[in-house]
């Protein structure tokens, strides 16, 4: 008997016939322009679309102004008691107010350099990114660039391993 076409599809919550609970995610946009109402939150929208398309349930979105302190405060609120993925968009470049990595570093307990490296290698301009990846309790935090294309490229580079990372953070077995 033929299985439905979706039966073999690998999503963020199914691997080799084993079903996992749907992973959850939060999106934090870091942008003075979005806060001021002079820019639309396109990168946050793209992050939500990509995550939802990969099988994540995006349970919260927030926007903060650029700056290390605002990012750190928001990340503490978003990761406190949370088991899931938190992505930031924006503030990872060389601009004077691009301080998302500094705010992230103040909160992250353990670095995940392989994820950050994979995201940087996803595009030639990624080499200009200062993005970080790391964990806070059972939350995985990924810094993404502020461009819509960069969000697509970076998430595309790591989403295949994020569910496994979340399982490990929740106490799952490595293999």
Describe the predicted segments one by one.
Residues 1-175:
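Non-catalytic beta/alpha edge segments that cap or flank active sites
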């Amino acid at each position: 008997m033929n299985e439905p076409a979706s039966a073999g599809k690998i999503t963020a919550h199914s691997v080799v016939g084993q079903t996992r609970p749907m992973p959850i995610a939060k999106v934090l946009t870091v942008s003075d322009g979005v806060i001021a109402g002079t820019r639309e939150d396109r990168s946050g929208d793209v992050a939500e679309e990509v995550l939802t398309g990969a099988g994540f349930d995006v349970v919260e979105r927030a926007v903060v102004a650029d700056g290390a302190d605002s990012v750190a405060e928001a990340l503490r609120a978003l990761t406190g008691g949370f088991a899931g993925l938190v992505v930031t968009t924006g503030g990872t470049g060389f601009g004077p107010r691009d301080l998302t990595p500094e705010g992230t570093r103040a909160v992250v307990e353990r670095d995940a350099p392989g994820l950050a490296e994979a995201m940087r290698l996803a595009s030639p301009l990624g080499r200009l990114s200062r993005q970080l990846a790391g964990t806070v309790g059972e939350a995985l935090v990924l810094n993404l660039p502020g461009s819509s294309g960069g969000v697509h490229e970076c998430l595309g580079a790591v989403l295949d391993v994020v569910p496994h990372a979340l399982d490990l953070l929740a106490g799952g077995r490595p293999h």
